[in-house]
Amino acid sequence: MNLDQLDKILVAQIEARTPNNGIDAMCQHAPTNRLIWWGCLSAWSIWRPTPPPVEDAALAIAARWVFQPSDDLRRAAALQAKSDTVGMCKWLLQAVQFSGGQLKTDEAGIAVPTPNVSGPYTKGFIHNLLATSPPVERATASQNLLQLARQAITRPMPTAEPTQPKPQLV
């Protein structure tokens, strides 16, 4: 399925007010980098203005992987996901870790193939995020996350980490 077809499905699910079906479609058909980016956008929208510190550290790893996918960041995600302090973003870190391809878990080890199971991990992350919303607000939050899913698949992907704007002298 291409991104235009997925976008049409998401639009239909938004209009039908069936966000769970839209979340399922996104997690089954979106490319991995766009799934991870959607997870980051969703977390930042739920935890506005700033995520809890432990979640922020995990989101930083996931967002950096979107900007520059590398095995080093996949290993960092795997290590952070095993940490006792990691919270809900553990799901998103595992989506990065299991984004497919060979992964050498340590310097002495051998490269082990990892399946691309980013979709199920991202789905778990999104549903856990929604569970933190009060029940009355959950339907609105679900619709908002589907709008973010549309942004993640229709807008150009970021290619470099954002930088702080330079102050303009007046």
Feature annotation, model-predicted:
Residues 1-155, 167-170:
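Structured binding/interaction patches within domain cores
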